Amino acid sequence: MTELLARLAESGAEYYRRGWMLATAGNLSVRDPEDASRYFVTASGGHKGRLRAERDFLRFELGMQNPVPQGVKSSAETIVHDLIYARFPDVGSIHHVHSPKVTLVSRLIGGGNLWELKDFEYIKALGFWGEGDVVRVPVVVNHHHIPSLGDAVERAARLDARVPAVLVDGHGVYAWGDSIDAAQRHIEDLEFLADMTWEERFRPR
């Protein structure tokens, strides 16, 4: 498990370098491959560019049943990860980042709407390979009551289980995959697609 957490820390460092997880924002998690009911998620307040496997991740059972060690604060958004892992057994890793263009596009599209992507070659990185495929990524309202946010993200994720992401209005994106690498690929792809969406639909002329 230490090796997987070290790999997840590498994702955090890469996101920080790109400016996608600044000011301790965001959270990352990975499911335990030895026990599908267990996952590890970043603790609250940690610098995402300097994560360490032995220090910055908390173990949880589905349902958030296990206690948090004294002196360590869990991320309030752990509940979002918990609900996604419970709903989708094939999900192996979840990444929540505040990448700039995705966050901007989430505001421009607005909560309760769908971000429609078509005719972009890059939707293949999200698993859509068919000619004429259309990807509809849900955008949910940013509830400050985190359990409500978790419910909103989980409900939106069920709209089309093929779509490995949900945007939160003004609050970045949750993306997932069957592995850390897959989740990171989806994060990177969505930021590229958001940049293209900005240029094509929203950039002032």
Each model region followed by its residue ranges:
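Glycine-rich flexible loops
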Residues: M1-R205
